[in-house]
Amino acid sequence: MGIDINHKHDRKVRRTEVKSQDVYLRLLVKLYRYLARRTNSKFNTIILRRLFMSRINRPPLSLSRLARHMKKPTREGMIAVVVGTITNDVRLYKVPKMSVAALHVTEKARARILAAGGEILTFDQLALRAPTGAKTVLLQGRRNAREAVRHFGPAPGAPRSHTKPYVRTKGHERARPRRRSNV
């Protein structure tokens, strides 16, 4: 008598192609698919995988965080690679000179990087400059920085839970008859 093996959970849950209809993103996917296949470098495979990701999994990286990572002495003259958006940070007073490759850079962040004597590359320019990812630093923003993530975890009210409850309002005595002070 045979064993009935259940294959219900066998699928691997990850994207194998880009979901977006953006033609420019699809062109980049074509390019990095080629590079990942033809070069024996892990860098291109990682870039390709990150290009497939949803926007939630490609969080923005602030200019101050980028500067902090690139200021390390071992990263002198390297290109910062961000598969996502680089945003401005007004708390950062002085932007260091650096080379950055990103999918998108906000207007003010772009102006500040260029004013500091840095350069901003697109991913097709990066493919020409560093086809195997030599002299590059792969960076990404914090995925758990979203406000929505605060609501995830053990139920609010459970012991040692720091999960934020979903409430519309806070602090008013909502039961009827309300106190005169809240009228």
Swiss-Prot record:
<dbReference type="InterPro" id="IPR000039">
    <property type="entry name" value="Ribosomal_eL18"/>
</dbReference>
<dbReference type="Pfam" id="PF17135">
    <property type="entry name" value="Ribosomal_L18"/>
</dbReference>
<keyword id="KW-0963">Cytoplasm</keyword>
<keyword id="KW-0687">Ribonucleoprotein</keyword>
<dbReference type="InterPro" id="IPR021132">
    <property type="entry name" value="Ribosomal_eL18/eL18-A/B/_CS"/>
</dbReference>
<dbReference type="GO" id="GO:0022625">
    <property type="term" value="C:cytosolic large ribosomal subunit"/>
</dbReference>
<feature type="region of interest" description="Disordered">
    <location>
        <begin position="150"/>
        <end position="183"/>
    </location>
</feature>
<feature type="compositionally biased region" description="Basic residues">
    <location>
        <begin position="161"/>
        <end position="183"/>
    </location>
</feature>
<dbReference type="GO" id="GO:0006412">
    <property type="term" value="P:translation"/>
</dbReference>
<comment type="similarity">
    <text>Belongs to the eukaryotic ribosomal protein eL18 family.</text>
</comment>
<dbReference type="InterPro" id="IPR036227">
    <property type="entry name" value="Ribosomal_uL15/eL18_sf"/>
</dbReference>
<dbReference type="GO" id="GO:0003723">
    <property type="term" value="F:RNA binding"/>
</dbReference>
<keyword id="KW-0689">Ribosomal protein</keyword>
<dbReference type="GO" id="GO:0003735">
    <property type="term" value="F:structural constituent of ribosome"/>
</dbReference>
<protein>
    <recommendedName>
        <fullName>Large ribosomal subunit protein eL18</fullName>
    </recommendedName>
</protein>
<dbReference type="InterPro" id="IPR021131">
    <property type="entry name" value="Ribosomal_uL15/eL18"/>
</dbReference>
